Amino acid sequence: PARAAAGRASASRIPRERPVAAFVMDVYPVTNGQYLEFVRVHPEWRRSRVKALFADASYLRHWRGDLEPGDRAPADSPVVYVSWFAARAYLRSHGRRLPTVDEWEYAAAASETERDASRDARFLGRIRDWYGRPTPEPIPPVGSGLRNVYGVGDLHGLIWEWTLDFNSALVTGESRGDASLERNLYCGSGAVGAADFENYAAFMRYAFRSSLEARYSVGNLGFRGVLAGPETAR
């Protein structure tokens, strides 16, 4: 795991910050190989047995079978098509939890050389370029991307990731420039970057999170864990 020192998450252009306590984050997202070991021990989370309340019909749809990921899900690639409930169960079994939006955005704002690269046009441009490309299949292995100044890898460039309080972002505006949308992105989510429309990558993350439900399983959505404090969401 990589340690992020305590700091403050700042919403650009709005004179308000939120404190973020120190936390320890997994260096990489959870892989198919790691998740396979989890479902071996916890059969209730196998594809054929999981309850519809906790995962939709797309859960692990790219795996060949309950205990056989297959060619579309290499062991060292991040696991996707997993619900929020499944991610939480996996991490609880390993003594960890999902990062909050604030924690994830705090870590994700760091580049290879800066703790806060939220004003770095080159850094933001690379993220936007990735968001504009289709997700490859199979997804490349973890470690394919860059590691930031904290030593955390693949926060951008491989997959989107679940957060503990993903549904705290509420997008209700009708256009990118809608004042109510900007207000909801900042006040509803209370984390980094979404209030600054120059940081379009952050806006896209908040919009994506607002579209999710906890049982959804999406082909480019995985997760990683953190060690820090009690779980408070849900």
Give the ranges of each region predicted by the language model:
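Short, solvent-exposed loop/turn elements at domain surfaces
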Residues: 1-9, 32-37, 46-47, 194-200, ...
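Cytochrome P450 core scaffold surrounding the K-helix E-X-X-R motif
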Residues: 2-8, 166-174
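Active-site microenvironments of metalloenzymes and redox enzymes
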Residues: 19-119, 123, 227-234
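Disulfide-stabilized, aromatic/cysteine-rich ligand-recognition loop
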Residues: 21, 77-78, 82-85, 96, ...
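Short, well-ordered junction/capping motifs at the entry into regular secondary structure
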Residues: 73, 128-156, 210
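Chymotrypsin/trypsin-fold serine protease catalytic domain
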Residues: 113-139, 183
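Acidic glycine-/aspartate-rich tracts in secreted/extracellular proteins
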Residues: 165-167, 230-231
